[in-house]
Amino acid sequence: MAPPQRHPQRSEQVLLLTLLGTLWGAAAAQIRYSIPEELEKGSFVGNIVKDLGLEPQELAEHGVRIVSRGRMQLFSLNPRNGSLVTAGRIDREELCAQSPRCLVSFNILVEDKLNLYPVEVEIVDINDNTPRFLKEELEVKILENAAPSSRFPLMEVYDPDVGMNSLQGFKLSGNSYFSVDVQSEAHGPKYPELVLEGTLDREGEAVYRLVLTAMDGGDPVRSSIAQILVTVLDVNDNTPVFTQPVYRVSVPENLPVGTPVLAVTATDQDEGVHGEVTYSFVKITEKISQIFCLNVLTGEISTSANLDYEDSSFYELGVEARDGPGLRDRAKVLITILDVNDNVPEVVVTSGSRTIAESAPPGTVIALFQVFDRDSGLNGLVTCSIPRSLPFELEKSVGNYYRLVTNAALDREEVFLYNITVTATDKGTPPLSTETIISLNVADTNDNPPTFPHSSYSVYVLENNPRGASIFSVNALDPDVDQNAQVSYSLAEDTLQGAPLSSYVSINSDTGILYALRSFDYEQLRDLQLWVTASDSGDPPLSSNVSLSLFVLDQNDNAPEILYPALPTDGSTGVELAPRSAEPGYLVTKVVAVDRDSGQNAWLSYRLLKASEPGLFSVGLHTGEVRTARALLDRDALKQSLVVAVQDHGQPPLSATVTLTVAVADRIPDILADLGSLEPSAKPNDSDLTLYLVVAVAAVSCVFLAFVIVLLALRLQRWHKSRLLQASGGGLASMPGSHFVGVDGVRAFLQTYSHEVSLTADSRKSHLIFPQPNYADTLINQESYEKSEPLLITQDLLETKGDPRQLQQAPPNTDWRFSQAQRPGTSGSQNGDDTGTWPNNQFDTEMLQAMILASASEAADGSSTLGGGAGTMGLSARYGPQFTLQHVPDYRQNVYIPGSNATLTNAAGKRDGKAPAGGNGNKKKSGKKEKK
């Protein structure tokens, strides 16, 4: 764009235009000014303060400012003198294109009165643009037989100025064959046409070079030139002709891209190349060429971009039809864009407050806003509304402005923030609407104390908590805001167990987090009662209290304590006595333990951790009772060691163990008798005696077996036969003499017993059975380990495999179950080679009986080497009263022959007051005890 031309009379013209605009505005109740374009920034437009009847110093007092409609600010107010000045350089062509008049409308807002004054400024065009050809060179082809006065359209010339400053005429360089003529259109610019003035002769001159000059009517005149190349063609006496000179069509603005608008058609009477017609656009701007496209072969015009009624409602297109040699015809295409309601209304908040006091009276103005719609007609008419449930209403102001005012009293405690939705709806079909939210805060007063969500709190803390750990948090809510809602927390002063409460817990005054200042112990402190106070920071401050109960939860921090059996002070292990005649389930002792914890942390369970003889004893899971799991055998060791574990149910569980020593014997004299018989024989004839005894026992067993078979055959009792066959077999275990200890070792063994036991000495039976107990509360430990005991029989004797059913007289209990490890071997499964040496004649048998009687007599007359007072069997005083000589049994009653139910002497005593299960004689002891 060319710079504006300065004229001597410019200032007088501006002053005259300003004066006329002022007088016209006063008469029409609207302020109007007129200025030329391209004025410098800050150029004077008009004295707006004077036209409003104000003084310059009142501008700031009344809040006078310019309010424009969504476009850039072109004008501004001079705060010193109140004059209206330009905010920058104004280009009329950019602002209004080629409109005959260019008017800029805006409003002057008086802020304190909320009054609007419309202002209109006309931008007057100046000659600041030079006419410009779209092409600097143009080739024109003319048939040599073209008639004089034929016209040929030339390229379009563009001048954005209007009036006299726009394109006015053309001038062609001197030539006798051609002249230029100016054509103008009602809705378009002027364009030149080349006029043929005479007859052409291609043979005389085939090419003409012309210079075309375009001039406007400004002062001074602006002009531009273009080169025209005229080529004379051979005869083509028919030009393309459009079916109509002007095509008109109306399309909606929401037409999809690529949709055909219309098709132009031109015909040529020639044939061949001279009759082939192509189409092209002429006299269109670059913007139009981006919106529409033309098919060069069919003449169909379609859209290549979206149409917008608000951007342009009318398009004029030039279409040219050209045949092969270059003859052409032109037509106009007039496209009218129909408005569619495709623009939603817009809401622009001009002024307003974001905060209002809750004591504001009804009618208080909150905001001023403007609504407009870019559509036209009914599509551009807009109405506004807000929800009726709100204490606000809309009042119509100047033009399309609205005021938002209150119509009821406000209460911040009920609603502290209003999001007022302003809905603007046009009257199009279908109607479009938009929503704008105006947020309004209600100012607060301190009229609400802090409140806790609960009337009381219960806090549960695990004991042994770390000091300083956060254990709970309280939160009080204050419906007020800002300073009135800042809550601080504190604890009421109190004492607990002689110490201030503040030494136990503390509270963060800002967050309300409660901290433990001590590590709590459930066994010492189980609960605390606190009062928490919440106060706000208003003036005056308000507060409230809440009760908080703190409960200490138990942790599994105490292991079970063994109360019984108690560990003696001398470090020895207590001894319990289990008679060999004890049946399965016999109560040997009971382990008693306690746990200082509570709940499941104090639930105790007992289990057998280790035993010298696995499967012999069991421990009640919940009772701690140590019972025999099976019948005691003579091969079982005299001394049994048990390790019982007591475990609680905490997480993780804690446990304690206790070691029990169980002496397997009917009574103390039995222990002495058994140990006395362990004297190894130094005579070589002992082995022969044992062999003879084994042979005798085998013979008796065979006779007994034959008798049983005959009896079963006579009675036809198959079941009884099976039972007797199982009891008929038996293995005899040997006992090498080199593995026994002397009787003198009994004294050291008995002196290790520090736990007092109650023994009975009237049992003379060796009742051995192997049932598997089935107590619901008993755990049987199957672990086994080997331990050398000086008072136990040899390992070879323990591992002797014999059928224990040979040694029992009572029928078996079918409710018991045998584990695979406890299941005895079959009858007669033992090798004969594994049996020991037994007395082989009557003399040897009598010698064995004499040895047993001598041991008993020695104990009776106090000559035993075990020591101790008379009649006490060498025991200490704590056992003396229970074991006098009158309780010493006749050991001959326990002597029997293996495989037979008969003893050497008849036994009158009965264990536990029960009769033997079968036979008239006493129950026999195992072969191991007989060998002893």
From Swiss-Prot:
GO terms, molecular function: calcium ion binding
Compositionally skewed regions (Polar residues) per UniProt: 806-841
Function noted in UniProt: Potential calcium-dependent cell-adhesion protein. May be involved in the establishment and maintenance of specific neuronal connections in the brain.
Extracellular compartment spans: 30-692
Superkingdom: Eukaryota
Sequence ranges on the Cytoplasmic membrane side: 714-932
Keywords linked to the UniProt accession: Calcium, Cell adhesion, Cell membrane, Glycoprotein, Membrane, Repeat, Signal, Transmembrane, Transmembrane helix
Membrane topology: Single-pass type I membrane protein
Span of domain Cadherin: 30-133, 134-242, 243-347, 348-452, 453-562, 570-682
Region of interest: Disordered: 803-841, 902-932
Membrane-spanning parts: 693-713
Protein name: Protocadherin gamma-A6
A biological-process GO annotation: homophilic cell adhesion via plasma membrane adhesion molecules
